[in-house]
Amino acid sequence: MSQATVEEKSKLRVIIVGGSVAGLTLAHCLAKANIDHIVLEKRAEISPQEGAFIGIWPNGARIFDQLGLYEDFESLTPPVHRMNVRFPDGFTFSSYLPRTIQERFGYPIISIDRQKVLETLYERYPHKSNVLVNKKVMNVRFSGKGVSVVTEDGSAYDGDLVVGADGIHSRIRSEMWRLADENHPGLITSQDKQAFTVEYACVFGISEQLPSLPAGEHINSYSNGLCVITFHGEKGRIFWFLLVKLPEKTTYPNTPRFSASDAASLCNKFARFRVSEDICVSDLWMHKLFASMTALEEGILERWHYDRIVLLGDSVHKMTPNIGQGANTALEDASVLASLLNNLSKLSTEDGTSAYAMTKLLNEYQSTRYERAKNTHDKSRFGARLHTRDDMIKTLIGRYVFPYAGPRVLERSVKSLATAHSVEYLPFPKRLGPAWGEYSSPNKSTLGSTPIHMLTLLLPCLFYFMYSKLNLFVSL
């Protein structure tokens, strides 16, 4: 018998808008806490095939394991154990950092078809009648002591909190801004309304097995204004993305949209670009099962909530896929919000659902998550520009520092992952590795200063390079 059938359900009611990875994970968390909730999804199905994939790192894996879901995902694909990096001058190097991450944390890095993740989250969710499809949200209304969500079909859903887990094109974010503008003009700044910008586009693809790309390996192939990254999964299935710098920077929502023909044209343009010694972009495209092209928004909001509305995941912070932390960061959002709601649900009905209590909770949610999410966003932003050799400094760092900075990169990765947030009211899994205990609280500077630390590493290398060239010149 489930916990929900033996304990009185909390009077608190949460409306989750978006059947995304973040939204469904939050639903699982709330189900574990016995908090009443529903999920409203605008599409006709929860898990459509869109050609996208997600990487699950230890910080996300631990949350999934707390929810009893991780083994389902782990069984779908082999772990990544080796990373191979290629530069335009033909220089390559390999690193077993992914294997070391697994040894330190007890969880490997895995890449999975996003459709499979959504499918598993839905199939393992205990209250499927709470997940409603074909529910496109039209507006949000504050009503007495609560909030109401109205959908396109005229239905209205009442609750104490609305959570926008509806992605970068968030309707809930738009409604939050509208209501704030009506009731507290100036609260939402022009900076927040222009926070998301686009400088890159990306083709995401899934391809059939290619003999020279062995399962469990991962390739980064860098060039000027371009990078291709691949992950090789179960039975050799290839998850890949081609990321390219666009001619001009645009601001959301006035950003480009791309079609299937745009994806084909871009991959044709770079058909001869080498992913490895034997594989080019044309090979990935010829063997594709699915592919799609999208603009890559980047940005993070300064205000994550207003009144009884709160945002999480891509609706509040959006990053490129280069460091594989977009979904994992959203999972951390869900875990923190659920933990705070669990605490709130234990108060009396009147105290637990009051506007004051909700505002206090949402302030704590943002203050807990903001700096870590901001640091992750900044690292992802730097990673995209490092991988595409965006300027001379990043070109030099990528080519002459990164290949030789393995221990430093590992230690910074460990520190960042070890200080991740999790679901406070659920026990930690038994499989946790030793690295989790090395740092006691979420770190505030591990990621944000990445460029400065890289420059610190770069200068000695440059001096050595210049000294070597000078000696060569003198010897001539």
Curated annotation (Swiss-Prot):
Its EC number is 1.-.-.-. FAD binds at E41, G55, R114, D314, A327. In A.calidoustus, the austinoid gene cluster lies on a contiguous DNA region, while clusters from E.nidulans and P.brasilianum are split in their respective genomes. Genetic rearrangements provoked variability among the clusters and E.nidulans produces the least number of austionoid derivatives with the end products austinol and dehydroaustinol, while P.brasilianum can produce until acetoxydehydroaustin, and A.calidoustus produces the highest number of identified derivatives. The active site is at Y222. InterPro entries: FAD-bd, FAD/NAD-bd_sf, FAD_mOase_fung. Pfam families: FAD_binding_3. One of its GO terms (molecular function) is FAD binding. Its cofactor is FAD. This is FAD-dependent monooxygenase ausM. It is a single-pass membrane protein. It comes from Penicillium brasilianum. The chain crosses the membrane at residues 447-467. FAD-dependent monooxygenase; part of the gene cluster A that mediates the biosynthesis of the fungal meroterpenoid acetoxydehydroaustin. The first step of the pathway is the synthesis of 3,5-dimethylorsellinic acid by the polyketide synthase ausA. 3,5-dimethylorsellinic acid is then prenylated by the polyprenyl transferase ausN. Further epoxidation by the FAD-dependent monooxygenase ausM and cyclization by the probable terpene cyclase ausL lead to the formation of protoaustinoid A. GO terms for biological process: terpenoid biosynthetic process. Pathway: Secondary metabolite biosynthesis; terpenoid biosynthesis. One of its GO terms (cellular component) is membrane. It is found in: Membrane. The lineage of its organism: Eukaryota, Fungi, Dikarya, Ascomycota, Pezizomycotina. Keywords: FAD, Flavoprotein, Membrane, Monooxygenase, Oxidoreductase, Transmembrane, Transmembrane helix. Belongs to the paxM FAD-dependent monooxygenase family.
